[in-house]
UniProtKB/Swiss-Prot annotation:
Subcellular localization(s) per the UniProt record: Cell inner membrane
Record-level GO cellular component terms: plasma membrane
GO molecular function: undecaprenyl-diphosphatase activity
Biological process according to GO: cell wall organization; peptidoglycan biosynthetic process; regulation of cell shape; response to antibiotic
Family annotation (Pfam families): BacA
Catalytic activity field: di-trans,octa-cis-undecaprenyl diphosphate + H2O = di-trans,octa-cis-undecaprenyl phosphate + phosphate + H(+)
The enzyme's E.C. designation: 3.6.1.27
Name of the protein this chain belongs to: Undecaprenyl-diphosphatase
PANTHER family: UNDECAPRENYL-DIPHOSPHATASE
Family statement: Belongs to the UppP family.
Misc remark: Bacitracin is thought to be involved in the inhibition of peptidoglycan synthesis by sequestering undecaprenyl diphosphate, thereby reducing the pool of lipid carrier available.
Length: 286
């Protein structure tokens, strides 16, 4: 059973939100699940559930970072779509990327809306329990291992088609299950879909921008109904730390995958899931 946690003071709230911002920034874009880590880290630190008001607002940092990092790509996509509308040049790489991003965003939008409308108990469902998150982490590690082992890795971003957006977009829906990882599911699907590792990661990030932004804004409205300890200052610290670390994580992963495989993430997710199960079994927590 979880014990009651007292409301933190200002300095503790600043430290908590700073750490949560770092965790958010690291885990949002690395294929290791931000939801899992944002659930587990506060429990291990003895902070309890930080609440929607904290996690939703801090996520703004990651949204700002990913849009800023890929601003040139997004501008090129907008120019490509605009040119295609005016001149019918839908076969240009930028236009095809825009189409793929649009198609790939629709499945998670519909699935997320369906959950909001028809599954009121989602936030407290067994899917969000520690053993479920641990099991999902292990399963996703195995799927990523298979994709790494058997994916042909020949496709580049300028070859993207609408079907790629649909395939990876359907995989993105799995991110609604805590512990899956949005970037993990889309990266895994892209590797199965024959993408080269750096292009798979880049497409995963670009495809995720609409979903991350919309989800963040939807959750943000709940922040105004939940007062946060310490007021605005801790949240601002969390936003800034999330933005900085998100930028660094995106940049690092794109460079890392130029020369390395995803096996390090497979191993991490396996260990994370196993250790999480061991901790849960030993503590008797839910």
């Amino acid at each position: 059973m979880e014990s009651a946690v007292s409301e933190p003071g200002l300095l503790e709230a600043i430290w908590r939100d700073f750490v949560l911002g770092v965790v958010q920034g690291l885990t949002e874009f690395l294929p290791i699940s931000s939801t899992a880590h944002l659930k587990i880290v506060p429990v291990l630190a003895g902070w309890g559930d930080p609440g929607v008001s904290v996690t939703a607002v801090i996520q703004l940092g990651s949204i700002v970072a990913v849009i800023a990092y890929f601003r040139a790509d997004l501008a090129a996509v907008l120019r490509g779509i605009s040119g295609a509308v005016r001149r019918g040049q839908w076969r240009e790489p930028e236009a095809r990327l825009g189409i793929a991003m649009t198609i790939g965003t629709l499945p998670i939008l519909f699935a997320g809306l369906a959950i909001k409308l028809y599954w009121p108990g989602y936030e407290t469902s067994p899917l969000r329990s520690v053993p479920a998150i641990a099991g999902v982490s292990i399963l996703m590690a195995l799927l990523l291992a298979l994709a790494e082992r058997f994916g042909p890795r020949s496709k580049q971003l300028d070859q993207v088609q609408g079907r790629d957006g649909l395939l990876v977009g359907l995989a993105q829906v799995l991110a609604l299950i805590p512990g899956v990882s949005r970037s993990g599911s889309t990266l895994t699907a892209s590797l199965f879909d024959s993408w080269k590792r750096p292009d798979a990661a880049r497409f995963s990030f670009l495809l995720g921008i609409p979903a991350i932004t919309i989800a963040g804004l939807v959750e943000l409205k709940d922040a105004f109904t939940e007062p946060s300890a310490g007021g605005v200052l801790p949240l601002m610290v969390g936003i800034v730390s999330a933005a900085v670390v998100s930028w660094l994580a995106i940049d690092w992963l794109l460079k890392f995958l130029q020369r390395h495989s995803t096996w390090v993430f497979v191993i991490y997710r396996l260990l994370f899931g196993i250790l999480l199960l061991a901790w849960w079994a030993g503590s008797g927590s839910n």
